[in-house]
Amino acid sequence: MKSLAHPLLQGPPLEERAYQRNVAAACLRESTLAVLPTGLGKTVIALHVMLERLEMGRVLMMAPTRPLAEQHADFLARSLDVRVELLTGSVSPAKREPLWQAAQVVVATPQVVEKDLIRGAAKLADFALVVFDEAHRAVGNYAYVFIAERYDETARQPLVLGMTASPGSTRAAVVEVCTNLRITAIEKRDDRDPDVAPYIQPVQTRWVKVPLPASAARIRKDLRKLQDRLCGQLHLAGLLTRPRKVSTTMLLEAGRKLQARLRAAGRDVPRQVYNLLSVQAMALKVAHALLTVETQGPTQFLDYAARMRKSSKSRATKWLLQKPEWKQAIIDAARSSDEHPKLERLDELVAQELAAGVGRIIVFAEIRNTASLMVERLSKLPAARPVRFVGQGSREGDPGMTQKVQKATLEQFRAGDYNILVATSVGEEGLDIPATAVVIFYEPVPSAIRLIQRRGRTGRDRPGKVYVLITTDTRDEAAYWSSRSKEMQMQSLFGGGRMEIKLPSRAELGGGSPGRDAPPVARGQTRLGDAPRVPLQSDTTAEATPAAEEVRLQVDHREFPSGVARELAQRGVTVAPTQLPVGDYLIDGRVGVERKTGADFVGSMLDGSLFRQVKALKQQFRRPLLILEGDDLYTCFLYTFDAADDMQ
């Protein structure tokens, strides 16, 4: 085995792989998005690039979660003979500031980097490389977008390396990620590339089909009857193109159309529009109930209905609970003694693989309640030692798992204390989960990104197996075909070394050092450079007027994600995060500001908290100020869609 050699390397030798060297060489030529399957050592590629760029300046590497950042920091500290510092939310702001100055390599979570840039504790001028792990997250208001813009504006010799297994299934999605990160080339490798093939293990995928139980079919019939009635009303109102076989995407689009009608109506909103919003919200809830019945079973549907009943605050929920079809569906589910046949097939598959000598198995499930049920059942199998692995968010009766507990659970799984990890979507990305011989999907996922991430948990150092459980004639089949289609579409974007995607060049983006000659297109690389320029935030932002005195602004921690703080920092305002007893902003110690959107304002009026907040604001500050933001004050409509509570 040939080992990687460099004066800055230390610790155990690292295998030098041709594809890692080739991808790194391409990344050194210009800011690049490296797209490789999970398990092919994207972190080692980043190390290759770091070794060259450390001669020119410092390096920043980011990962979206603290456990993944810790994993990167541990690897780099073992491998590099330079000072590596880990900066996460567990390190206080006061302690982080000197570490920014002392470290040659900083590994951090993007939220910490964003906050430290806004408050002026971090400067990126002398960073010669910034690495964005899980780069596909660089969309919308995610911190990666702001950090990339600030880096491009301030760095003397900027170079960006984005890393992901799945950049997006459409050209527009990939363009957005690359533009947001100031990336001008894409370097992709997969099992079709000759320099990768020796390191790829085959993964066998098997689709395991089960029938829908008769009891679930009866419940589905009740819910479909209700859904057809609700969608029929939306169709008659011109909000849907058809009254039946309506997807969740179509229902969400109907909601956007209704919100547009609200804004257009101004203060004189017809009562029918509000009623239709409730109908649309009910249809979304019924759609999730149908999905639960078909893919999970009557037990999970009853759990969803019970939680809805306990939190029946919205008008849509109250109306739905009174519908005769909904009531009948609950009666039918309560009478049912059938378990979903997926559970029995899962038991059989796990028992079969354990008997064959498989040491570790990961089972992915969409819903926490199902994950708990699976752990309970699997624990009864001989030699099975299952453990549930879920996200940090709390649900009613389920507090979730802290990052400390998550890390301990994964260590026990790695050590063999547990041999079956039953994980929700938290196990797909951003955590150091050991590779396994077998991965089981309890249900297909419609997202190509999630499909690739789940499948990437096997087939790393040995051949792997993937089982996907599918209930026939249900939404499971639609999800399967959706993810497969999107994955094939993603592959077609980069095939054959053709210039499939055109993005703004660095000169067009307005940053860095223009005028460099473009490198030739190589196998697996996509040149980016001829599309119409996508306007950046800084293009449309008025230049800040220099103030006679420096304005100092304290921002409550809860307001940082809003994007206002980063906009103020862009305009030259010194921003400091703090814990304010009242309000969202404090200007020069005198002016206290409470910021509310139209929905916040109406909500605080309805729950009676508005006047208490205003009174406290007046008592606390010399100059109290209430800012109402947005143009929907007279038209905003509050309703909830609580299906997401099932996830994670």
Describe the residue ranges of each PLM region.
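Conserved Walker A/P-loop ATP-binding site and its immediately adjacent core
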Residues: 43-45, 58-76, 168-170, 368
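Conserved helicase ATPase motor motifs in RecA-like P-loop NTPase domains
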Residues: 37-40, 136-137, 156-171
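Conserved helix/coil segment N-terminal to the catalytic DExD/H
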Residues: 91-126
